[in-house]
Amino acid sequence: MDDMKRKIVRTAGIIMSFFGTAVISVFAYRKISRELYLRRLLKENINFEIPQLNIKVPVLEGTDSKALQVSAGHFEGTGSLGHGNYCIAGHNSTIYAEIFNDLDLIRIGDEMYLFDTDKNRTQYTYVVTEYKIVDPHSVEVLNDYGDNRLTVISCTDDGAYRQVVVGILQEKS
């Protein structure tokens, strides 16, 4: 009987090892696929960076769920690069490791960058002038204020409010 128990335990161990390896392989494949997709998006689209927070993401046109799954999204109808109020949004969730998780750590005076898709990858440097928490229905943050600014919007971690970071254009190079 002891020999039979050993065979069962050994067989169970082999089966568990096989399934464990398969599960890990699936997750590794998904992570690698997502990383490769993200690299392609960074190469083909406008890029947004906040070096102090280790944020570097592509900016896709529109804020639909498909765009926001992998990137920040530009609110259609708001400014263009270096002109007006260029507004972008991205997800925040410490549980799911989303792109704007650390947005609440931004400080006045920090720099944010947008990189164009042109041949020279023109850099737009914005200096943070404001961080605030607003009601989800506060759409006035999307308004044109007559200056050249970047507005970054994301949920608070609990999703009840919106974090808003405003930076004023300092340089185009």
Spans of features found by a protein language model:
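Solvent-exposed, non-transmembrane regions of membrane-associated and secreted proteins
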Residues: 5-173
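Juxtamembrane low-complexity tails/linkers enriched in Ser/Thr-Pro and polybasic
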Residues: 1-3
